[in-house]
């Protein structure tokens, strides 16, 4: 509903209480959609790790509300309505039509495993909103390739349902390109159920308050969010801030340098990014992925409580040269773009550290180490694919230590519990622990990385593990030390020079050690009782406690 439509309807001004009530109802709808998707899902990646998101768009494709799931998925959803109506004019869309896509350049995605499902919400015979969700399908992509044509099946926005009737040929085409079609089919059904839940709830909301009032409140909510964002930006001292960081992963031979220049002008913020030309590896980031990453970073710094909708975007201005790693063009490969996104957030924090040191955190693990194991389960004779991204340390803050062993920034997924992993797959977790001394020393210590050792049991399987920060460690702030680096080792402890991939035979294992995070402040100022606690809990070694923190004659913890 445009401003003119609102004026003609007599609803140009909606009272703040009504806006709050309807805004909260919209939030409840997308959260309920998200829970429906997770509970109905079949794969461990969605039902256990919650690698999915849900969203409502208005009729024009603006984000009304997104569930508090995966910030990166905002990029996968920005522009998806425009992609749909570009291929399927609005006048041809009917109630019961469902569209599906995944392509990073034409399908509303940022990499191919993220499948978007979108359905129009008809109220009083017209499209009032779009119910949308996205889920990461574990076996939907191949890795380590030079361009997107090699990464997997590309799906532009196509109709999966026409007026409630499934296009079986479209579904068959998708499933034929999957290694575990039953898992994919049931996750797609869960996505369908989530959207249907959202449609039902949105219609009920319109039935209670009236379609025009709900749409007017949505418009007011976007304006309110814009005002909150502007107020938050205005708390950053005006000026120009810059930062650069080195980017290394095991998918490219040489380090790359990313840079950002940030200008704060009153209640608006301008961010310009420089990066090398796009590479022949899946580390490139499409434009919408960059938008989502920046929106997340700015939101968390200026107002974490600000609603996640299109009003947030208005005072944030972003630029990056096309054809570069941070704004790639087809046919650049994009599968591992999360590695790149994490570094973008670190860049923004590094640049703004002098301006708002109390809100900034030191560099996080920045790696999003990804592991994929696939083979034939000897217990069932069926093919399996186990995918997991493994967390690490989060950066220390001005008044608190970083968190240990977590996903950070734009990912926000859960870990797969060992019990669920071993029950679902023919794999054994031999070790799962925090990594001593991996948190950067400081007045406030960086979070610790994780160690996970996985063994193939009763069969041979294919393993693919890759990550970042194997050479450039997560940096500290204001005298804080850097965190530990990433390591990937095949038994018997040999670290490959490039990404670890290949045949893992029965009884062999892969050991994954994720980076820690940077410290904040001079470690000599750290409270002695905290150092002793860390020593007792084996967070730091006696050597580090003595040499870095200056603890006199620390006693090693009991064995």
PLM region descriptions:
Residues 2-95, 100-123, 127-556:
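Glycine/proline-enriched, intrinsically flexible loops and inter-domain linkers
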